[in-house]
């Protein structure tokens, strides 16, 4: 598994299980010669067009972002028709068996959420600015009540 991280987070990300870590501050991961079966852009910093050359013949690109002008939704609808590289766009659904499965993973220690910072509801503006800064590592939690 390969991922990107800042130089100061490389060892931490390796502890989480990454085999290869690319420092996004000094290297452009889209310039690598490595081919991938799956690329997951969790922060919306890339695009299918940028990542397509990095995907294997049947590779999949998934992003949590809509992309420029909603392009990821368009690609998700049309790329499966051509049988090669494709885009998946996550559409959340509530499914009890998925929640139970996630609960079991957490209880067994297989899934450890990475929490960067906690904010109160009164600090929502500060939390938003921090997330938008691109400096967060993991999740930012907004506490609604104690």
Name each region found by the language model:
Residues 1-146:
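Terminal helix/beta-alpha structural elements that buttress the NAD(P)+-binding lobe
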